């Protein structure tokens, strides 16, 4: 179906893995970007011909399928799934069960009988798909296959551009930003000047991927307004997921309301999300602010740590009322360290490999006289 599992276990040989089969819409977008980056760094196009299998979904789990396809076939399946879940009314990607911020799992809910999900949208995932469309076009063009898909993906790119411009850009007349998303039939929004709970709320990831995906080049929201979003989200431990947080009585947003203020995804510094914002700041040539974020996020700079001091944790909590100041839920999150490294390579050093070469962006600010990078 082109819908990968959210999580899976590595079972003993011959055994069936356990899988998290919830329909988070963003599962495939990371796969496309990962393979694109692998090709850009290595030039190893043979991987696209590698044969790999599938698991079929059955009640209560999965079973190994007899079907075997190439890696490229799998990528096309992923893209098919994603583009068929673009909401035709708005040109943006439906949220389904949710996106990277899995605590905000209410946008995809529907009240229509017979339907599992509605037409609520994740703007972050929409922008990730926008990036995937360009990546897949480059891959297919490079290996000279599927010109019909290249044309289709170009059409979908334009559909998303228009959808973002019309529905995801919000303004109060003096400033603009990219909203986080909306619920069924656009009956309520998140990350706007007047959210579902009546507050003016800033969201980090949608504004970050507006820049990372290069949608920023369309000029729908100014650099000054995007930087202003991150200034409002900044805190003692770095960029927060949201500001303000979601109170327990906030309707329609999902289980995030059950998280205490300033913890996990509910208005805390979640490392991945903060680094997405940091990369966006680097790409906007806001180097001094970006390095300030790096300093806040590194555990070695903290006076108090509740997890392993030399390992990137997943988040930092801050809630004065609950006596929380820098606590982390858990560490040994290799994804946090990985995202930090990618942010330094792309952001600090400006190194962006592509299928046709290497682009190096010269930054306006650097905090030291010299530094080196070996890839």
Report each predicted region and the residues it spans.
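Acidic surface patches and DE-rich sequence motifs
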Residues: 87, 170-171, 354
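Aromatic-rich carbohydrate-recognition surfaces in CAZymes
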Residues: 1-92, 122-126, 130, 267-290, ...
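Structured alpha-helical bundle/scaffold domains in large eukaryotic membrane-trafficking regulators
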Residues: 47-50, 145, 172, 356
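Catalytic cores of carbohydrate-active enzymes
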Residues: 6, 128-253, 295, 299-328
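Non-catalytic C-terminal accessory modules of carbohydrate-active enzymes
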Residues: 231-232, 263-265, 276-375
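Carbohydrate-binding/catalytic loop surfaces
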Residues: 2-24, 55-66, 92-118, 173-203, ...
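Exposed alpha-helical structural elements
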Residues: 74-77, 221-228, 340, 361
């Amino acid at each position: 179906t082109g819908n990968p599992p959210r999580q899976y276990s590595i079972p003993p040989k011959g055994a069936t893995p356990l899988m998290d089969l919830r329909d988070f819409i963003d599962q495939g977008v990371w796969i496309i970007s990962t393979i694109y980056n692998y090709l850009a760094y290595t030039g190893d196009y043979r991987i696209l011909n590698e044969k790999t299998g599938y698991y079929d979904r059955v009640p209560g789990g999965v079973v190994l399928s007899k079907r075997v396809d190439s890696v490229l076939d799998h990528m096309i399946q992923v893209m098919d799934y994603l583009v068929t879940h673009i909401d035709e009314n708005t040109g943006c990607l439906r949220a389904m069960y949710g996106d990277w911020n899995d605590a905000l799992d209410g946008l995809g809910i529907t009240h229509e009988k017979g339907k599992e999900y509605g037409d609520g949208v994740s703007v972050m995932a929409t922008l990730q798909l926008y990036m995937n469309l360009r990546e897949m076009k480059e891959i297919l063009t490079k290996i000279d296959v599927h010109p019909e898909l290249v044309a289709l993906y170009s059409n979908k790119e334009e559909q998303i551009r228009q959808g973002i411009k019309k529905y995801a850009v919000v303004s109060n007349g003096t400033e603009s930003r990219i909203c986080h998303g909306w619920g069924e039939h656009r009956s309520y929004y998140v990350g706007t000047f007047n959210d579902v709970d009546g507050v003016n709320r800033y969201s980090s990831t949608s504004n970050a991927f507006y820049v990372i995906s290069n949608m920023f080049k369309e000029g729908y929201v100014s650099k000054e307004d995007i930087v202003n979003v991150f200034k409002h989200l900044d805190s003692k431990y770095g960029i927060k997921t949201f500001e303000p947080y979601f109170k327990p009585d906030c309707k329609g947003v999902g289980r995030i309301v059950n998280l205490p203020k300033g913890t996990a995804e509910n208005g805390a510094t979640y490392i991945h999300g903060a680094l997405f914002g940091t990369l966006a700041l680097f790409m906007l040539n806001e180097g001094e602010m970006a390095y300030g974020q790096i300093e806040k996020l590194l555990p070695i700079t903290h006076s108090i740590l509740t997890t392993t001091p030399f390992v990137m944790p997943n988040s930092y909590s801050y809630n004065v009322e609950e006596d929380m100041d820098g606590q982390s839920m858990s560490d040994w999150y290799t994804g946090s360290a990985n995202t930090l490294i990618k942010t330094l390579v792309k952001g600090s050093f400006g190194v962006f490999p592509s299928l046709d070469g290497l682009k190096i962006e010269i930054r306006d600010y650097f905090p030291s006289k010299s530094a080196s990078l070996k890839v």
